[in-house]
C-alpha cells in the first residue's frame, strides 16, 4: 500500500539474470480497469450500471478473407444489455472496447504513458498513421477502419505492443486500495549506519484517480472475485478484489488486492501444466493466505460515494415497480431521477 515491495519470485530458467518480474508481457484483461473502466468512471462517461449491448463492436476480415465479428468473447454474445460492472466481472471484451471508444482512445493512451509510465510508443504511431476519427460509424459496411481493431485491442484488451511488466501492474493496482494514490515501488525501506538512519527512499505520492473512483473500481473488482472470472482467488474472511487476464499468446494473469497488499501473478502457459497449478487467481489466493492479513480490516466508503439499488432493465435508480435490481456504488449526484421504464 505504501509502495513497499515485500517479495518477488521468478523462475530463472538457469540464468541468474533472468527475471520475469521485470520482463514485459501482454497484460490481457488486467489492463481493462486501468485503460478503460477507471478512466471512464473518473470523468463520468460511465457509472456502475451504465448499459451496453452484449454484441460485437464491428466486423473484420479474417485470415481466410471471411468476415467475422470482432472482438471475440469467451462466451457467445447474447444481444442483451449488460451493466458496466457485470461486463468487467465477466471480462466482456466487446463492452470494454465500446466503453473505450466512448471515453476516447487517445486520452487513454496519454494516461497510460504520462500517468502510469507505460511504453505506448507503437500505439501513438498507430494513432498518428490511422487517426482516431476513423471509426466504425463512418463505414457503411460495418467493417472496422484499417488499423482500428489493432489500436482498440492494444488499449482495451491489453495488447500493448511493448508489453507491461509484473512490477508495473502491481504498482498500478495499488491505487485501487490506496484512495486513488500511487507511491513508487521500493524494495528497501531504509539503510542504517552506526544505529542511525542513513538513507530512506524519496517516494513522491501522486494522485492517479479520485478517492471516489478508486473505491468504485475496488468494489467492481470485488465482484470479479465473488462472482466472476476470479472466483478461485476467494479467501475466507478476506476482502479480496482483483482481475484476471489472458492473451492469445499464452499469457495468464491475476492481479489481486486485499487491504494493504497487492499481488500480481503472471505466467506463460505450458501444455504440461496442471490446470489447478496454473490458475493465476489460485496462486494469488495462496499468497494472501500466507500473508495472514487482518480479516477485520475493511475499505472505508468515501463520503462522495453512495450505495444504491439500481434497476437492471434501465440502469437507473430502482423504483418500487422495478422487479430486477442490483446494488451498485455511485458518485454522489450520478442520478437525477428514478427508473421510468418499469412503470
Predicted regions and their residues:
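Short, glycine-anchored, charge-dense loop/turn motifs used at functional sites
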Residues: 1-6, 116-117
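A penicillin-recognizing enzyme superfamily signal
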Residues: 5-23, 27, 33, 163-171, ...
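Extended, hydrophobic alpha-helical segments in both membrane/secreted and soluble proteins
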Residues: 5-6, 27-41, 48, 95-96, ...
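Flexible glycine/proline-enriched surface loops and loop-helix/loop-strand junctions
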Residues: 17-22, 79-81, 89-96, 128-158, ...
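A generic secondary-structure signal for well-formed alpha-helical elements
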Residues: 43-47, 103, 107, 112-120, ...
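Conserved catalytic neighborhood of penicillin-recognizing serine enzymes
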Residues: 46-108, 136-137, 152-155, 194-223
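Surface-exposed patches in mature extracellular/periplasmic domains of secreted proteins
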Residues: 49-50, 120-134, 138, 147-150, ...
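Mid-domain, small-residue-enriched loop/turn segments at the edges of structured enzyme/sensor domains
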Residues: 65-74, 104-171
Amino acid at each position: 500500500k505504501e509502495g513497499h515491495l515485500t517479495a518477488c519470485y521468478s523462475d530463472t530458467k538457469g540464468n541468474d539474470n533472468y527475471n520475469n518480474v521485470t520482463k514485459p508481457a501482454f497484460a490481457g484483461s488486467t489492463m481493462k480497469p486501468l485503460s478503460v473502466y477507471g478512466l471512464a468512471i473518473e470523468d463520468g462517461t460511465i457509472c456502475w450500471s451504465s448499459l451496453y449491448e452484449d454484441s460485437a463492436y464491428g466486423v473484420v476480415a479474417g485470415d481466410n478473407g471471411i468476415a467475422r465479428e470482432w472482438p471475440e468473447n469467451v462466451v457467445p454474445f447474447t444481444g442483451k444489455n449488460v451493466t458496466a460492472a457485470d461486463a468487467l466481472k465477466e471480462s466482456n471484451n466487446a463492452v470494454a472496447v465500446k466503453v473505450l471508444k466512448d471515453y476516447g482512445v487517445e486520452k487513454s493512451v496519454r494516461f497510460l504513458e504520462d500517468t502510469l509510465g507505460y511504453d505506448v510508443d507503437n500505439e501513438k504511431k498507430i494513432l498518428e498513421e490511422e487517426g482516431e476519427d476513423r471509426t466504425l460509424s463512418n463505414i457503411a459496411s460495418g467493417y472496422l477502419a484499417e488499423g482500428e481493431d489493432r489500436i482498440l485491442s492494444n488499449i482495451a484488451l491489453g495488447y500493448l505492443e511493448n508489453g507491461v511488466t509484473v512490477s508495473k501492474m502491481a504498482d498500478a493496482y495499488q491505487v485501487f486500495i490506496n484512495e486513488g494514490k500511487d507511491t513508487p515501488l521500493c524494495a528497501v525501506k531504509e539503510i542504517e549506519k552506526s544505529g542511525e538512519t542513513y538513507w530512506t527512499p524519496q517516494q513522491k505520492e501522486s494522485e492517479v484517480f479520485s478517492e471516489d473512483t478508486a473505491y468504485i473500481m475496488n468494489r467492481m473488482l470485488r465482484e470479479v472475485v465473488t462472482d466472476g472470472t476470479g472466483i478461485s482467488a476467494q479467501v475466507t474472511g478476506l476482502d479480496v478484489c482483483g482481475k484476471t487476464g489472458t492473451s492469445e499468446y499464452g499469457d495468464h494473469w491475476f492481479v489481486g488486492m486485499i487491504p494493504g497488499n497487492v499481488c500480481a501473478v503472471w505466467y506463460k502457459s505450458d501444455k504440461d501444466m496442471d490446470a489447478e497449478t496454473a490458475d493465476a487467481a489460485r496462486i494469488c489466493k495462496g499468497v494472501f493466505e500466507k500473508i495472514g492479513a487482518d480479516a477485520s480490516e475493511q475499505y472505508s466508503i468515501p463520503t462522495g460515494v453512495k450505495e444504491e439499488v439500481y434497476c437492471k432493465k434501465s440502469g437507473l435508480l430502482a423504483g418500487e415497480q422495478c422487479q430486477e435490481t442490483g446494488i451498485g456504488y455511485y458518485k454522489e449526484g450520478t442520478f437525477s431521477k428514478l427508473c421510468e421504464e418499469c412503470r
